[in-house]
């Protein structure tokens, strides 16, 4: 990382280079390093920016994503670099961060991610108060000797999925059982992060049945399960949730349509609540 900074802490230009170990076979290396590259300029926007990244084949096992998808590496290097800048220009690190962090309403030109709320400053205020940061920062200046104390904070920015670097897609199948319960299949597989629970809650809320009546098979059979691109990049609930919600709403409409055919009551006056089809006007 190379940064050109004015004495008042204004970022003038930045350059970022990164390499990703791909291993001996093609895997997620390209999108992992690209995610880090994409996150780097968004945290501290700068008008003049150059980012280059490379995927490198090595004589090692195939490399892939595991908890972070390229962004933690870029954030670690970037935040260490920010502290080096502050030391070089004699500026308090948190003051520099507040000056340069992306403002509310900022939209990144590459990913189209937008910052909707002032959460960065809120988190920094809370963290600094809990650490008693200002007092410790002043107290720990100008130390000598082999053992010294220090205090610091870093800012982390992360987003889900890999769009626009790679394709994002998800699909879902739902089956209504004879007892009124429901089972669904999705290619976005549970690997311990709790997405099946989130999915079940989405289905229950969208269809209008108790969550106890929603069943999902965590170990999916790829022969019969709709296609999903995988469990990576913190994408499960966000990307998989869209296909699940659309399928659940379509199933709900189909159930109400059948109720209309049986009762001749318009679908517009019917509702599905807690597993029961009712009239909206009186709940009966």
Regions found by a protein language model. Name each.
Residues 1-23, 241-278:
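Phosphate/diphosphate-binding loops
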Residues 100-181:
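Helix-loop-helix junctions that connect adjacent transmembrane helices in secondary transporters/permeases
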Residues 20, 49-54, 171-175, 210-236:
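Flexible glycine/proline-rich, aromatic-decorated loop/lid segments
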């Amino acid at each position: 990382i190379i940064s050109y900074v004015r004495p008042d802490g204004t970022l003038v230009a930045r350059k970022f280079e990164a390499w990703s170990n791909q291993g001996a076979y093609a895997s997620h290396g390209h999108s992992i390093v690209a995610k880090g590259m994409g996150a780097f300029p968004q945290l501290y926007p700068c008008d003049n920016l150059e980012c280059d990244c490379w995927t490198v084949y090595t004589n090692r096992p195939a490399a892939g994503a595991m908890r972070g998808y390229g962004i933690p590496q870029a954030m670690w290097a970037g935040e260490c670099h920010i502290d080096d800048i502050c030391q070089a220009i004699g500026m308090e690190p948190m003051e520099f961060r507040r000056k340069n962090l992306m403002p509310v309403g900022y939209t990144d030109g590459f990913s189209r991610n937008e910052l909707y709320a002032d959460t960065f400053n809120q988190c920094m205020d809370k963290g600094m108060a809990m650490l008693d940061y200002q007092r410790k920062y002043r107290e720990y200046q100008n130390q000598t000797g082999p053992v010294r104390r220090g205090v610091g904070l870093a800012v982390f920015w992360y987003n889900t999925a890999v769009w626009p670097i790679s394709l994002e897609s998800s699909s879902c199948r739902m089956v209504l059982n004879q007892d009124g319960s429901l089972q669904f299949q999705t290619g976005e597989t549970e690997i311990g992060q709790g997405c099946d629970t989130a999915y079940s809650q989405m289905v229950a809320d969208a269809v209008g049945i108790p969550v106890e009546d929603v069943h999902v098979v965590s170990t999916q059979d790829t022969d019969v399960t709709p296609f999903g691109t995988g469990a990576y990049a913190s994408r499960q609930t966000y990307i998989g949730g869209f296909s699940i919600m659309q399928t659940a709403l379509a199933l709900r409409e189909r159930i109400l349509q059948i109720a209309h055919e049986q009762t001749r009551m318009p679908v517009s006056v019917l509702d599905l609540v807690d597993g029961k089809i009712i009239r909206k006007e009186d709940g009966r």
